[in-house]
C-alpha cells in the first residue's frame, strides 16, 4: 500500500481581532501554530479536531487542526498504517515545535475540541467520533494531561485559544448557514484525503463571525 504523504503547514493568516483586542492567527485544516506571544489562535471545527497544548512554565503554547483519513471499506491494518500514522504525525509536529521552544513534555497540558457529527452520514463510523477518540487516546498514551475537552455533539465550533494563559473559548455554531458551510468544506477535505492519501496544505476558508453560543474552557 502506498504510504501517504503527510504535509503539515504553519498557519500564516494573521489579523487584528477587535473582539479580543490583540493579534490573531487563523488556522485552516492541516495547519498548526506555536508561539510564546500574547496572541489568540482561532479555528472552526466540524468533524475535525484541534489540540491546544501548552507548557505554562515555559510560556509557550500552540494549536493544530486535523482530520483523520476516511477508512471506510479498509482493513484494520490500513487504519493503523494510514489514519493513525496521519493523526500521530499531526500531533507530533505540534509537540516537537513546542519542545523546540523550551517546553518540557512532562509539563504539557492539552485542551481538545471538535469531532462533531457534521459528517455523520459520510461513513458507517462517524468521522467526528473517530477523530475525537483518536486525539484522546493519543494524549493518554503520551501521558499528556487533558485539562479540558469539548468533543462530539451535533454542532460545528469556533475555538479561540490564548496560548500564554491557556484560556480557550468555544462557540457552537448553531446557524444553519454556518453548519452547511462547514459541512461542505469538510466533505471536500475528506474527499481530498481519501483520494490522495493526504490533505491539502491549505484548506478552504471556514471562518465566520456569526453569533453562536459560547463557553469558556
Curated annotation (Swiss-Prot):
Function: Probably deamidates glutamine residues to glutamate on methyl-accepting chemotaxis receptors (MCPs), playing an important role in chemotaxis.
EC number: 3.5.1.44
InterPro entries from the UniProt entry: CheD-like_sf, Chemorcpt_Glu_NH3ase_CheD, Cytotoxic_necrot_fac-like_cat
Protein name: Probable chemoreceptor glutamine deamidase CheD
Signal peptide: none
Reactions catalysed according to its record: L-glutaminyl-[protein] + H2O = L-glutamyl-[protein] + NH4(+)
Keywords: Chemotaxis, Hydrolase
Coiled coil: none
Similarity annotation: Belongs to the CheD family.
Pfam families: CheD
GO terms (BP aspect): chemotaxis
Domain of life: Bacteria
Catalytic class of the enzyme: hydrolase
Molecular-function GO terms, alphabetical: protein-glutamine glutaminase activity
Gene name of the encoded protein: cheD
Disordered: annotated span: 194-217
